[in-house]
Amino acid sequence: MEHQLDPDQEESILITHFVNPHQFSYVRCIDVENSAMLVRQIEQDLKDYCSSERTKQVYVEDERVIVRYQRWSPPKLVRGVVRRRQNEEYLVWILDYGFNLCCSVWDLWPLPDHLSRSLCDFKEGGVALIAPHSGSVWSRSAIESLDKQLEDANQLTFQVVHRGKSNRNFGLLKFRSSCQTEDAANFLIKQDQGRCKETLTMAIPYEDISFEKAEINDMAIDTRPRLRRILELVVLLSENAKESTPTPSAIQQKKLDALLQSHETYLIPNSVKLLSKVQSISESSMQTALANRSKQISKELPHKANQSEDNRKKEVKYLESENLSECLSKVKLSSYQQKNTDSSTLSGPRNLASSSTNSNSNVRKSMTLFKSSGAHLTTSLSVPLTENCTNQSNNRTVVFSMDKMEQIFNDMLGKNPSERSVQKNRSQMPNSNVSTTKRCVEKMHVCRSENMGDRKPSVCLKHLVLAHSPEPVNPVTSYKELPLGNTILNAMDDLNFQTPLPTQIYAWPHLVNRGSLVLVNPSGTGRSWSYLPVICSSVLSSFENVTSNLDTRIAPGPLAILIVDSVENAKKLASHCEFLMKDFNTQNLKVVNTHAHSMMDVYMMLLNSCGVLVTTLAHLNNILSNELPLVNPTRLEFIIFDDYDRKRLDNAELLKEVFQKVNSIGGLSKQLVLVAQQWHSERFQKLLNRTTKPLILFGDFLEAALYGGLKFNVTLRSSALKARQLLDILAEQDGSKKRTLIYCKNQMELEELSAILIEAGLQCVDISKAQNQSPNRLMLVDDSQVRKQLPVRNIQLLIHFSLPESWLRFSRRFHTMADNIRNLFTKPIGRGQDLITYILMDENNAKEWPRIMKFLQDHGLTTQSMPDSEQQLDNTLPYCPYKLSNGNCNRNQCNKRHHFLKTDLPKIGNPLLQPGTLIRCKFLKAYDPAHMAVMPMKYKSKDSTIWIDVPYPSYPSTLVFKMSFGVPRKVHNPCKINDVCFVQHKELLSRVRIVDNPARPQVTVQLMDYGTELLQVKASQLLECPEQFRDLQQLAMDIRLSGLAGSGQGGMWSTDSIQWVQDRFADINEEIMQITVDFGVLDVAYVKEIALIEECPTMLTSVYKTFLRKELLRQGFAKIDSTSILELRAIHEQWKQEMEELRANKENIVCSSTDLDNRDSKITSLQNKQATCSSGKEEDLNPVETPLIIASPNSNETLEERKHVSDKVQNKIDELNDFNKSVEIEHVQDASPLDSSTALINTLIHELNTKSPTKKKNTQEFIKNIVHEDETQSIHHEISSSTNSLKQDKTIVVGPQDPPKELFLQYLNCATKSRESVYPMVKWHQTLTHIELVVEQQMLEYKLGLDGNTLEYKVNETTPPQRFILNLLGEVRIDSVKQHGYYLHIKLTKVGLLFHWPTLLNSLYVQKHAHWLIYDSERSHGPPPSFGLVLWEGYLTHKKTKSYSDSESSEFSSTPEDFIEPGVEYCEMDSNLYED
């Protein structure tokens, strides 16, 4: 289909993939029209090749695949080719629609070779005669604006003018809307996003296609307009083309003629005539067109009302006939829907009509199609993998493809095809008859079928779990097979609960049969739904079957007790139970959550009886300890512990106590459901011995192997020694015939290891011979060869030569031992095969060592000596977000760090988290009485008396509306830790930060602006956050009351305490919330106190109304618990001590500096430096010229080591300096600059006191030119005396304000002169929020660019050219650029926090080395005030002083004792804690 485009001809195109104006993929509309019919026909055939048997675990690049496109409704099957792989995702190019798709391996199948022929000719294109406005890279705004125009256009035309080296067509692209037609190049130029380029040669780099620019294969995302356009066009064109089919090729025509001229009569049964619509059979001809069967249907189905029902029955009957099976094995028909008018239903059969053909035109055979008057069959609500075939009972056509025609031809002529045997076809795809029958049965299933019980789950589904019980367990395939009741079934239907998990199909029928269950599986695997439907169904059955026994009917207590680990899970599971029973009307309490009511209310509810009691260990212990009979053992049916391991880690003693009380009331004899993450052999066996009909269900095969007595052996050695170690392990087996499996990481490692083992005399087999493996042969497998499971399940020795990418895959490897795991109920202990595994670790996967050791320790397995590198490796991991947010993390497979480091403490430059800082904030949310989310508004540092507003770039109350309106909704991809994105939360867009991105579909994010809680969302729900919102600081801050815990058991907070805090802080509009920071860690502020203040404006003071810490202790809601923050307190005290030592030694460190020019000279001793510092003399008044080097008493220390230590100390000193500047930023801003005479004197002093002889000589010559020759003798002494006087005057001291040279060169790196270029004169002025530059220009034309922190200005038209480069201190953006004559005014606005803005440009170094850059001292002073204004201000000050005895500075300086009011409680803590 290669077509050379005419450079002089415009053609209508469709753009399917747009990267930038110079790179997009397009296809001609005529090509889409010509190939639409074949594309649809191939897509209908793809469904036969998408069975579960044909799936693969890994696909390689350039492999042709079948893709399930989820974003189409319903999902459709398309063809694609793999371009790249990244972890579990694949980047696939869709062949027939021309775009990249990011999809998972579960949406891919191999594409057969005979269906891989390319049909559409997609080309690479670009807009000619255009270039980016600046540079060679297109800006994001240019790409988005043109992309939007192209998507909204009604028609696109393209005229090729040049072909690039990479076969990319550059031409004139025009888009036509309803009102006008515009050229793409002109559009970019008008938008100031492109510039005209006259040359046709486009040396534009080809941007690599990445996952970020690909479409995401998720049904929750709508199809983009450009993709929807081509998809709908293919469907429409194929339907319009059904009236005529293409003429077969010459070879196929000969085969058809030979078939039709055959004298053998090809008998077709009547049933096939009905399904294939064969009109008649004669000795010499056979019609394959559709015929009207309305007469036949009218004879067989006289009642029109039952037509649809009978049609379904007949179709199923015909599909099950033996004659049809025999016929379909030879003739395979593919059908698709036809659309005709109703008038054609009464027309008779028509003959085939063909038109004349020639070699250069498309030849089509016209065919009249008919539509019967019968009603259409109702389709199933969800039919997987059959979306592309729209089956209608009365609208079918028969199309013979090339392969099908060849098969008929070979059958009729008695030929035996060599390469297309029936066995090969059956091995490549499922039987068409069986699959068609199955699909029709699924379509006919519109209600709950009673025959579902006859179907058995697939073998692979059984192998996904390990189920052990005294009696065989019969799993189900659907919840509809269970007697759950209509209420539960309807609720499950509302949830669209279609495919149950393997653990659920075993747990449901066992619980229905009154059995007990121990389920071992990780969290997030649907464990709760393995028992919830059955529990709720049993509760509703008890409500319906009211007993006649009065004692049982009025018995108190619940029918089921559900014990969870946290308040959050209690709320979640209670809502699940309420949803399942929502349609059942009863006066009884169906669900009671003890954490949603006060304990007194809970007691009353239990006395009146209820259905399901959802509680925690602490509350259940109180209920069972109560004197009232709140739980009746005769009424109780279920006891569920979810999750056992989390309860054990939280409070093992309380868990043991609750088990004893439950056992004392006979609760363990009831139906027990115990959900855990780990197998605890001793404890669980005792529980199972007391239960009836126990079932142990494992979804985690690693835990199942430990249940079977697996012996762990873990080693950590160099990768070079692993092969030798493996040979030693195999030699230690003493010839015992153990079936051995060795896992490798990839194919290359497998081949290398196989060669080593064969060379050592061992026999190796691959995965293809897994079923016939003998014990003396080693089977080698790599992860890429394995799909979900291997066909072997009798391995005795499992060796992990390398670890997989995730812990989930590592756990799945142990399924190969499933058949050798002995059943605890049927086989005596001591029998069976020993299971052994070896994990060979090296430096490549050493980071998993701590996790494996922790896993072994949690299971009570002995571990040998651990390497010293464990702590170091563990410190590289990020801190666990769940532990930081909730205070604990009970996830068994958590791979995050659970201990704090010094690096977790806040930087000194962040005053909000410094000890002693007072913060006035706005209350957002209370998660518990000691954990809240607030929005800081003002703060005052510990040693300051000034309140400073928190500098938010955007007003907080309007930020949420700005984010919700006018922001493009694009899915954020890929998801990385700490990425900022949007999520739809409470009907508004909210900023969130990704804190955990596990291998599961859900991503853990944390709110940033109006809360700090963690949310579990799907990756498709994360939206792209524009850059203007991405860099804004977080509005919400997490605060915790340090050293305080709930008064309940295990430190839990009571419901009353939570309710009291919410009521107290819900409406504090007239009060101010003030917190006192104790210390901070990882953006969480641990506070000493949370106070509510009421201001008294008339008295110029304020009153403390509530101290939260004292109120919680006074009312008995809380207790002192300092153990929870001992680790944090110790790290903070150590860090505080280091900072104090740095402050004490600051002067010594500064005075220990040496000259930069004499870096290689001998370093003086530490004693000499201290003496120099104590005498008050400085070697160099300009610290910019001198680097900081710490003198070490160790003479063997190298210069590089000293330099490293000096840099480390200097960074800490700089942080201290920045902190002082941030606290007193207003004083720094108001400091008046030095006058010119003082600057000149300081410069001369610096030059004369330097160690460089050349500088001294040049300075003396300069002074000689100013003063007389006879006065030069005393100049040096006079300047020295001036030095002492300047040091005594604190107002003109310059040294401490100047930055060190290293920092100055880093912050202000002015461009050096290059050839004949010069600097323009620039005036600099800065405020707290802005920087203003005034540039003297020689020409009105200039170029100004801002890249990050670098500002570049250049004028190339002048001779010599002008330019300068400024590397600014912080990130800025250009606010305005104005031209006033030959002066260019540039205004820059700071981005981010405003208290990191030190002033550097009034230093001597700038005036000396950047002579072209001067500080605008006149503007910093401002115009002098008028005399009248001065008098008026003096009068107001005098009047104010006379009226009030105290000044305004003492407004908040009073202690709580100074304004005690009757009936108000105050905290008995240090008074300076609340001092403002």
Curated annotation (Swiss-Prot):
Residues binding ATP are 521-528
The entry's cellular-component GO terms read: cytosol; Yb body
Q: Which domain of life is it from?
A: Eukaryota
Instruction: List keywords of the entry alphabetically.
Output: ATP-binding, Cytoplasm, Helicase, Hydrolase, Nucleotide-binding, Repeat
Catalytic activity, per the record? ATP + H2O = ADP + phosphate + H(+)
**Where does the record place Basic and acidic residues bias?**
297-313
Ranges for region Disordered: 292-313, 339-364, 415-436
The record places domain Tudor at 8-117, 929-1043
Tell me if ATP-binding is a UniProt keyword of this record: yes
Keyword Nucleotide-binding in the entry? The reply is yes
Top EC class for this record: hydrolase
An example molecular function term from Gene Ontology annotations: ATP hydrolysis activity
| Annotated motif Q motif, positions | 477-505
User: EC number(s) per UniProt?
Assistant: 3.6.4.13
Q: Tell me, in one coarse class, where this protein mainly resides.
A: cytoplasm
Biased region (Polar residues) positions are 339-348, 424-436
Q: Where is this motif: DEAD box?
A: 642-645
Q: Which GO terms describe its biological process?
A: germ-line stem cell division; primary piRNA processing; secondary piRNA processing
Pfam families in the record, alphabetically?
Answer: TUDOR
Question: Where's the CS domain?
Answer: 1317-1401
Q: Can you say where in the cell this protein is located?
A: Cytoplasm
What role is this protein assigned? Involved in primary piRNA biogenesis in germline cells.
Question: Which protein are we looking at?
Answer: Putative ATP-dependent RNA helicase SoYb
Q: Which organism is it from?
A: Drosophila melanogaster (Fruit fly)
Which classification does the entry list for the species? Eukaryota, Metazoa, Ecdysozoa, Arthropoda, Hexapoda
Write the gene name: SoYb
